[in-house]
A protein has these predicted regions:
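Conserved N-terminal catalytic core of the sugar/cofactor nucleotidyltransferase
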Residues: 2-10, 18, 36-126, 137
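Short catalytic helix/loop segments, enriched in acidic residues and glycine
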Residues: 25-40
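Active-site acidic Asp-centered loop
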Residues: 130-132
Length: 293
């Protein structure tokens, strides 16, 4: 088994019902934060972390994803003719970012099933999973932090942060033992527990590095919460066979699958743009004054 994390899976087969009607005919992963699709932020994180190949697990109405990361010859020709060199370079860079593959998840059977769809792509290697609802703004890319942890412990690593106690029922929650600095050893985990039953407020937040042993478990995994094949349930079984660690990553994480989180990300990323920042701040000040009146 290769000990280098080279491949990543990005599940993108969800229906995006929280963003209807915008997602009726387009992938929720293509909704833009400022002027870049959410999925592109995640792919850029993977590339910056050293990932060489990416498999996107798609569903129906996801053709826009493939089109975005493919070449657009007509657009390139038009930009070239109009001498828009910067835009042309930007468009060409998107299609040249990394080797991207696609597979269709024919039925929405859960995150565990989506990961299992990637079995032949992954082979016998450790791999990363990056969820499309989670964008992390960090000095060192979130996935790179986790790969550094994997390189030390050579086993499955879950990306975690603490969440508000009242929100534990939205996440996979861990029972852990503190090992060092930001590293924990996982003792147990539960998918979306009731607040009073949660073992902690340490939540898995959309980033995983997993050993290939998970595929044998997923093959026989019974449906869990919501009647779906839950990745957390399979990881719970994996924890009985090998050590699993959790890494409390640095950075601000945005849940862009939630409308408020999406808006927060849009504002913060807009403020990072030099060409937008000053005027946008003035606009926000006027809105703040309006709200206070």
């Amino acid at each position: 088994m290769s000990q280098t994390v080279r491949k990543a899976i990005i599940p993108a087969a969800g229906l995006g019902t929280r963003f209807l009607p915008a997602t009726k005919a387009q992938a929720k992963e293509m909704l833009p934060i400022v002027d870049k699709p959410t999925l592109q932020y995640i792919i850029e994180e993977a590339i910056a972390s050293g990932i060489e190949e990416i498999l996107i697990v798609t569903g129906r109405n996801k053709k826009s994803i493939e089109d975005h990361f493919d070449r657009s010859v007509e657009l390139e020709l038009e930009l070239e003719q109009k001498n828009k060199k910067e835009m042309l370079e930007m468009v060409q860079n998107i299609s040249n970012m990394v080797n991207i593959h696609y597979i269709r998840q024919k039925e929405p059977k859960g995150l565990g099933h989506a990961v299992h769809c990637a079995k032949s792509f992954i082979g016998d290697e450790p791999f990363a999973v990056l969820l499309g609802d989670d964008i992390v703004d960090a000095d060192t890319p979130c996935l790179k932090q986790m790969i550094n942890c994997y390189d030390e412990y050579k086993t499955t690593v879950l990306g975690v942060q603490e969440v508000a106690k009242e929100n534990v029922d939205k996440y996979g929650i861990l029972d852990v033992k503190h090992i060092e600095d930001r590293v924990y050893k996982v003792k147990d985990m539960v998918e979306k527990p009731a607040v009073e039953e949660a073992p902690s407020n340490i939540a898995i937040l959309g980033r995983y590095i997993i050993t290939p042993e998970i595929f044998n478990i997923l093959e026989n995994q019974a449906p869990g919460k919501g009647g779906e094949i839950q990745l957390t349930d399979a990881l719970q079984t994996l924890a009985t066979k090998e050590a699993i660690y959790a890494y409390n990553f640095e950075g601000r994480r945005y849940d862009v699958g939630d409308k408020l989180g999406f808006l927060e990300a849009t504002v913060d990323f807009a403020l990072k743009r030099p060409e937008l920042r000053d005027e946008f701040i003035e606009f926000l000040k006027t809105k703040s004054d309006d709200v206070e009146r």
